[in-house]
UniProtKB/Swiss-Prot annotation:
This is Momilactone A synthase. NCBIfam families: PRK07231.1. Pfam families: adh_short_C2. CDD domains: secoisolariciresinol-DH_like_SDR_c. The keyword NAD applies. Induction: By chitin oligosaccharide elicitor and UV irradiation. Belongs to the short-chain dehydrogenases/reductases (SDR) family. The phytoalexins momilactones A and B are diterpenoid secondary metabolites involved in the defense mechanism of the plant and produced in response to attack (by a pathogen, elicitor or UV irradiation). Momilactone B can also act as an allochemical (an antimicrobial and allelopathic agent), being constitutively produced in the root of the plant and secreted to the rhizosphere where it suppresses the growth of neighboring plants and soil microorganisms. InterPro entries: ABA2-like, NAD(P)-bd_dom_sf, Sc_DH/Rdtase_CS, SDR_fam.
Amino acid sequence: MAAGSSHVSADARKLVGKVAVITGGASGIGACTARLFVKHGARVVVADIQDELGASLVAELGPDASSYVHCDVTNEGDVAAAVDHAVARFGKLDVMFNNAGVSGPPCFRMSECTKEDFERVLAVNLVGPFLGTKHAARVMAPARRGSIISTASLSSSVSGAASHAYTTSKHALVGFTENAAGELGRHGIRVNCVSPAGVATPLARAAMGMDDEAIEAIMANSANLKGAGALKADDIAAAALFLASDDGRYVSGQNLRVDGGLSVVNSSFGFFRD
């Protein structure tokens, strides 16, 4: 079933009875994932600092299936409150999607990067998922089940695709994911991350200074996988659905790359030719 489909039949729904918190859930990948999770039967807490967008999304999804909380992922109190809100409103927490992220200023040289900017990117992109994982595990461990997912990046495995701060944060996030999986597996909790290539989202538009069409054209041209078109936020949502659902019941400690093979191919070698 395609991520963007308007309806999912009852027998095909993968998250019936599940409760999820999605940080950065008001727009981009987070909003696409919230919509898909609800289509598959989940109840979703949208956690974000974009209050108007969050309220609009919840109005779209409906109050029985969703709720919005203001959440700055660098503030531990906010993250703990988002998790507690999910439990208070919907009775439990099954899925934590640490999706909030920032790209930071486009610093092309270390000499142009400030310590404050570097630390801000790490605070959101690395400390945020740490806090989300910590507090999700707090309520998941007694239940002996749960799936924790974080949004990493193509930059978690290749260099030269983003700033030093962003690349560092995503490399470190993969390491944290693996270590957290090692600790939490004994409690029945799976921990994974998703690493997309460039996808047209508000974050990408701001970082690249381009519109959706230009971003998609660049990524489609650089992609190793041809004929599939441009990577969409819906594709990332579908990957998160796999990891959140019982389809991924034995998958933990993994970095699921959704990049059409871009991260494993060095096209400059030119060995494979038509």
